[in-house]
Amino acid sequence: MMKKNRWFWLVAIIGLGLDQLTKYITVQSFETIGDTFGLWPGVFHLTYVINTGAAFSFFKGGAVWLRWLSLAVSLGLIFLGWYAPRMRIVEQLGYGFILAGALGNGIDRFLFGYVVDFLDFRLINFPVFNLADTFINIGIFFLLLASFPPKSSSQKNTSQ
């Protein structure tokens, strides 16, 4: 069954691994919450923060219901990847990235009650975020691409 939507599973597993690894490295590398390291001072820093809300600290303090939302989304996507007919590659990538992000942040919420964030773009004063947040946005982008119908072979021939 996993062969059917292999890009979905591959992206989800690798993405989840990268997300959890980078969060672990962040926690082990910084002594206290709020510590920062400027990779490109004033532009991009690694900053250790915890987030009890959703992406960009929306719904701050909503960890209880957010953990269940993460679980529901994750289970729904696992069900989709396992039982749905073979998806187009762009759909597999989209759903796989979203699953990686939902699982990554969901694991944190269930284990710790918060999510570890560390990617800090200061040039544009953007909220600190993590790879799971990035993966969810990449997944949405792929699903938006997938929403455009593929060109049929007759359309391809007439546009040349």
From Swiss-Prot:
It is a multi-pass membrane protein. It catalyses: Release of signal peptides from bacterial membrane prolipoproteins. Hydrolyzes -Xaa-Yaa-Zaa-|-(S,diacylglyceryl)Cys-, in which Xaa is hydrophobic (preferably Leu), and Yaa (Ala or Ser) and Zaa (Gly or Ala) have small, neutral side chains. Pathway: Protein modification; lipoprotein biosynthesis (signal peptide cleavage). The active site is at D117, D133. Its EC number is 3.4.23.36. One of its GO terms (cellular component) is plasma membrane. Pfam families: Peptidase_A8 (PF01252). It comes from the Bacteria. GO terms for biological process: proteolysis. Belongs to the peptidase A8 family. This is Lipoprotein signal peptidase. It comes from Gloeothece citriformis (strain PCC 7424) (Cyanothece sp. (strain PCC 7424)). The gene is lspA.
